Amino acid sequence: MNATHAIVVPFEGLASVVDDLRERTCVSKPSHGMPPHVTLLYPAPRDVEAIAEVLVAFSAFEVVFARLDRFPGTLWLAPEPAERFQRVIEALVRRFPDHPPYDGAFAEIVPHLTVAQSAFDEAVVSVEMRLPLRSRAERAVLLEHAEAEHWREVASFELEAV
């Protein structure tokens, strides 16, 4: 069985704002086990111990999603402070050089929380009036997706630097 893995910071508290749109417009749907999230590394290794060794250096932090932005084909919420996510992403990339983010498809990795992959006008109206959204990055999770199966949590890593 071939499986794909992702390391994400879940924001389950934002589900009431974005999950209806994500369910109708996104490839990785809530009903397939993918929570609202900011991706740290995809594809990712399944090396739980090595991931834990990287993430132990990072602590939880407050996150504000105050604006919407777009990539081609994707409407997303911008997390602030983005630099906190960027530092974790860079540490994971250094530790796992054989797993470039998004298989190296993008020159720059921009931390984001996907809201919709179509129906953009509806999504803007639905989400923009509820901004800013506040949450907390408290943990990262390693998710696994096997063929014809949903995403499932393999491991959880509390962000509590020691």
What spans do the regions from the language model cover?
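Basic, often amphipathic N-terminal segments
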Residues: M1-E62, A82-V141, E153-V162
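Short, exposed beta-strand-loop hairpins at the edges of beta-sheets
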Residues: E144-E147
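Charge-rich, low-complexity N-terminal segments
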Residues: G73-A78, A107
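A short, structured active-site edge motif that brings together acidic residues
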Residues: F65-F71
